[in-house]
UniProtKB/Swiss-Prot annotation:
One of its GO terms (biological process) is peptidoglycan biosynthetic process. This is Phosphoglucosamine mutase. GO terms for cellular component: cytosol. The keyword Magnesium applies.
Length: 443
């Protein structure tokens, strides 16, 4: 069944345009509250947010919607998405709610949800919510209204949780680390986590003003981090996105490592300690070099649809622990129930500290195949999937690439874009093939 409002990561859009309007968000919270009350008499939800100026307005709308359905609310303030997931589980709440549009610019915002266990919710739950949205509201009477309170030490609790995932016998003393929080949800907690584990911290992207989230900083704009690492002669650079669930890492030389490489490093570190890693989940976008390297070490590799929720579903299906995406969403289910940029960074740094090796040394076995990704903005009403020209050009490209490359064309789950990815042994060929497909889509 097609979902009307939910995309691959909750509900997202431009603030002031449907569905990201205060009236819809109030109705959404009321509908979610009614779904919760089918199985629980007095549910409690936690609400966290990133640093967008619109977060205050949407937080108020959510609070009113939940209270009007007889649901209690706990406000967490600005907090990374994985922090909300952790506290939902730790506080035994019924649901976690995050107000964020992740890596998108400040004009966008969104709403996503976590189960009582701190995991992304399945499609069937989203269908139930959309069905409730189509029904008339049932307002709670005055005696049954929900109540709201704040959890003042939410950030401190999450900081301690992150630190608990780092080995007790190791320290970050002697390391200088540049931390870029994208002027987003981790602007307070990220520098403190690394500082309290012993590192000398240089903070950038940690001065939000409501309008600058993800603007030329963070995981989607790593050049600022690269320049800062070089300028400060730092050992590492850590870049998070607006809600801190994804990671990009830079070494002392300013080389950028993406999620595919870091996923392999996490596997390698565990195998080096004789921990079993029966299998790993990537996505349709994961670089072929990672798959080849893992299979050479006897580790099964499965590709999920793009989106960390689908990686999680495959991990749970196979009962595996490690998975991720090239964008920097990494999952280690023995550490956290969802992708966490801070915890992922700590696991990578732990591998470096424990081995005494640099990132380049740890990843010497993996050389990523050249990949070209082009985003093509769709025209209103454009039905690209039925294009005969696109089908013909795609067949031609796949024939040219053969077994030494891949073509992937998919719609974005969060923006009106079609993403064209070509992977080949040769960078020039990958670029040329991707441009052929992109030009066909643009006609």
């Amino acid at each position: 069944m097609t979902r009307k409002y939910f995309g691959t990561d909750g509900i997202r859009g431009t603030v002031g345009q449907a569905p990201i309007t205060p009236d819809f968000v109030l109705r959404l919270a009321h509908a979610v509250g009614r779904v919760l009350k089918k199985s629980e008499a007095r549910p409690t939800v936690l609400i966290g947010k990133d640093t967008r100026i619109s977060g205050y307005m949407l937080e108020s709308a959510l609070e009113s919607g939940f209270n009007s359905a007889g649901v209690d609310v706990v406000l967490l303030g600005p907090l990374p998405t994985p922090g909300v997931a952790y506290l939902t589980r730790a506080q035994r709440a019924s649901l976690g709610v995050v107000i964020s549009a992740s890596h998108n610019p400040f004009a966008d915002n969104g709403i996503k949800f976590f189960s009582a266990q701190g995991s992304k919710l399945p499609d069937v739950w989203e269908h139930d919510v959309e069905a409730a949205l189509d029904e008339p509201p049932v307002w709670a009477d005055s005696a049954s209204l929900g109540k709201t309170r704040r959890l003042d030490d939410a950030a401190g609790r999450y900081i301690e949780f992150c630190k608990s995932t780092f080995a007790n016998d190791l320290t970050l003393k002697g390391l200088k680390i540049v931390v870029d929080a994208a002027h987003g949800a981790a602007y307070q907690v990220a520098p403190k986590v690394f500082h309290e584990l012993g590192a000398e911290v240089v903070a950038i992207g940690c001065s939000p003003d409501g309008l600058n989230i993800n603007h030329e900083v963070g995981a989607t704009h790593p050049q600022a981090l690269i320049e800062a690492v070089k300028a400060h002669q730092a050992d590492f650079g850590v870049a998070l996105d607006g809600d801190a669930d994804r990671l990009q890492l830079v070494d002392h030389a300013g080389r950028l490592y993406n999620g595919d490489e870091l996923l392999y490093l996490l596997v390698d570190e565990r195998l080096g300690r004789d921990e079993p890693v029966p299998g790993v989940v990537g996505t349709l976008m994961t670089n072929m070099a990672v798959e080849v390297a893992l299979r050479a070490r006897g580790v099964q590799f499965v590709r999920a649809k793009v989106g960390d929720r689908y990686v999680l579903e495959e991990l749970e299906k196979h009962k595996w622990l490690l998975g991720g995406e090239g964008s920097g969403h990494l999952l280690a289910l023995d550490k956290h129930t969802t992708g966490d940029g801070l915890i992922s960074a700590l696991q990578v740094l732990q591998a470096c500290v424990r081995s005494g090796k640099k990132l380049a040394e740890l990843l010497a076995e993996v050389t990523l195949f050249p990949q070209t990704l082009i985003n093509v903005r769709l025209q209103p009403g454009q039905d690209w999937q039925v294009s005969a020209n696109l089908a013909s050009e795609s067949r031609a490209v796949e024939t040219e690439l053969g077994a030494a490359g891949r073509l992937l064309i998919r719609a974005s789950g969060t923006e009106p874009l079609v993403r064209v990815m070509v992977e080949a042994r040769d960078a020039v060929q990958a670029r040329a093939c991707a441009e052929r497909i992109a030009n066909t889509l643009s006609v």
